[in-house]
């Protein structure tokens, strides 16, 4: 457990360091590491995934997976995260940037990421440059991916290995539920509760806007004077389009900018059957016996018809 916490802390620190030095800052998003850092289990008791706490807009996703799988088999679970690729989001530096996508797949216990040497070449080609990892050392059945370029990865493919009940007594041949989530674009809230610049900012008091100035960094400073003569100042992040103007009277919490968010998060659930091979063999044997019976009945009928025809001729 201590190793797991150290790994999460290290990953979190690296993420902050990368952002601090400005690498890929235009594509900054709410990294999965934020969820990993703050939630030991990403699925709450009510079924809500942790990603939805930062990605406030709801957008649909789709899941594609086989209905049934055999023990030790490798199969694909595909999460589709569709969006309009002509749209751009507001980057952390206030400039327009393409959207990134990310996904989370919560598999039944025992199911896990397929070993690299067993992943089909076709899947490796599709996932070229994509890094899929377990949520933590404790939950290797929960897989996360992202952030990655959305224009080329609207279909997230997870190669999964099914468990073998013969080797693990805790696994049974049953129908299991699994859960998936996918987001496009940056989050509106950081894990600390602070708003990101992909959000709507409300007026901190009622009153008249006496002055609006823009700094060299592109930030907007808004002065609001209330009826009691108290003046407050608000600073809005760079890149936001204001929905108010100087001299306008506003109410408390009235939006000061147009909603810049073009992304959103969605989650779905489905089921998968861990099929017993013996049942399949039994089913095939049953089908074969039915086929043989049908053939025998047809042959018997033909034989009977020949006997009847011979008696009539006699």
Swiss-Prot record:
Signal peptide (UniProt feature, chain positions): 1-30
Chain sites annotated for binding heme: 31, 51, 54-55
Pfam families assigned: Apocytochr_F_C (PF01333), Apocytochr_F_N (PF16639)
InterPro entries per the UniProt record, alphabetical: Cyt-f_TM, Cyt_f, Cyt_f_lg_dom, Cyt_f_lg_dom_sf, Rudment_hybrid_motif
Keyword Metal-binding belongs to the record: yes
Membrane-spanning residues: 280-300
Membrane-topology annotation of the record: Single-pass membrane protein
Record has Membrane as a keyword: yes
Cofactor binding annotation: Binds 1 heme group covalently.
Gene Ontology, cellular component aspect: chloroplast thylakoid membrane
GO biological process: one example: photosynthesis
Compartmental location: Plastid, Chloroplast thylakoid membrane
One annotated GO molecular function: iron ion binding
UniProt keyword list: Chloroplast, Electron transport, Heme, Iron, Membrane, Metal-binding, Photosynthesis, Plastid, Signal, Thylakoid, Transmembrane, Transmembrane helix, Transport
Cofactor requirement: heme
Subunit (UniProt): The 4 large subunits of the cytochrome b6-f complex are cytochrome b6, subunit IV (17 kDa polypeptide, petD), cytochrome f and the Rieske protein, while the 4 small subunits are PetG, PetL, PetM and PetN. The complex functions as a dimer.
Function comment: Component of the cytochrome b6-f complex, which mediates electron transfer between photosystem II (PSII) and photosystem I (PSI), cyclic electron flow around PSI, and state transitions.
HAMAP family reported in the protein's UniProt record: Cytb6_f_cytF (MF_00610)
Family stated for the protein in its record: Belongs to the cytochrome f family.
This protein's name: Cytochrome f
């Amino acid at each position: 457990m201590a190793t797991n916490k150290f790994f999460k802390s290290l990953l979190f620190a690296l993420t902050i360091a990368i952002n601090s030095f400005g690498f890929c800052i235009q594509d900054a998003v709410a990294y999965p590491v934020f969820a990993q850092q703050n939630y030991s289990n990403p699925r709450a008791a009510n079924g809500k995934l942790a990603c939805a706490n930062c990605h406030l807009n709801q957008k649909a996703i789709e899941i594609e997976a086989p209905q049934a799988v055999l023990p030790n088999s490798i199969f694909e679970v595909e999460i589709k995260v569709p969006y309009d690729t002509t749209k751009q989001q507001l980057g952390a530096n206030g400039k327009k940037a393409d959207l990134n996508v990310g996904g989370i797949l919560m598999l039944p216990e025992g199911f896990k990421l397929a070993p690299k040497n067993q992943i089909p070449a076709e899947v490796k080609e599709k996932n070229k440059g994509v890094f899929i990892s377990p949520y933590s050392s404790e939950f290797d059945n929960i897989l996360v991916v992202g952030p990655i370029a959305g224009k080329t990865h609207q279909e997230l493919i997870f190669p999964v290995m099914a468990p073998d009940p013969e080797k693990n007594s805790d696994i049974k041949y049953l129908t299991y539920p699994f859960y998936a989530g996918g987001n496009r674009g940056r989050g509106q809230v950081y894990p600390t509760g602070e708003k990101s610049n992909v959000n709507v900012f409300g007026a901190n008091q009622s009153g008249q806007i006496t002055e609006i100035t823009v700094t060299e960094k592109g930030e907007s400073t808004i002065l609001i004077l209330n009826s009691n003569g108290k003046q407050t100042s608000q600073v809005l992040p760079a890149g936001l389009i204001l929905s108010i103007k100087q001299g306008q009277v506003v109410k408390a919490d009235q939006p000061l900018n147009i909603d810049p968010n073009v992304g959103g998060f969605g989650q779905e659930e489905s089921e998968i059957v861990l099929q017993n091979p013996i049942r399949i063999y039994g089913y095939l044997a049953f089908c074969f016996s039915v086929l043989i019976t049908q053939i025998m009945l047809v042959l018997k009928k033909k034989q009977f018809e020949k006997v009847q025809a011979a008696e009539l001729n006699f």
